[in-house]
Amino acid sequence: MTPRLRPAVFLDRDGTLIEDKGFLGDPAGVELLPTVVDALRLLAANDYATIVISNQSGIASGLLDEVKVRSVNAEIVRRLDGDGLAIDGWYWCPHYDDGCDCRKPEPGLVHRALREHALTLTGAAMIGDRGSDVELGRRVGIPGIAVPGPFPYVGPEPDLRAATLLEAVEWIVRRGR
């Protein structure tokens, strides 16, 4: 029997789920953004898979390592677990702009997530605070949604400029599959 495919919402990590503090390697620095729990709860209630897609060039530049990235992700998991929530997949690019296929806006990590999970792009979206997030959405044929981050947005015109992650998720759910 073929598994039922779930639509995915691809989420940037820094500036979208948590405060962007530069090259965060200390789990104690994790601060969930204000509407994250409500947004993830709404996605779960509507059976969307949540997949984090993140550029972590601090690894290539020596400011971070895989252990630190995993420890920050684990702290996010711990905090969400306290609210009965989970992230379905964590993917990050450890490279610095070296032509790889996994650094956003390249679609390599989205394609990997699609292979590793029973996901569909029908009804899917990409949410992030940078132009590379919106461009990634475009490259895989899904809406790219911009949420405010610590830096002015520079990039292609998003399908939606949302004031919060929750507003972005409400738009996705209203659009349906």
For each feature predicted by the language model, list its residue ranges:
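Asp-based, Mg2+/Mn2+-dependent phosphohydrolase catalytic module
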Residues: 2-4, 66-89, 97-126, 130-177
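Conserved protein kinase catalytic core
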Residues: 18-20, 25, 61, 135, ...
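Active-site loop/turn elements of alpha/beta-hydrolase fold enzymes
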Residues: 20, 55-56, 149
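A broad detector of the eukaryotic-type serine/threonine protein kinase catalytic domain
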Residues: 22-23, 58, 95, 118
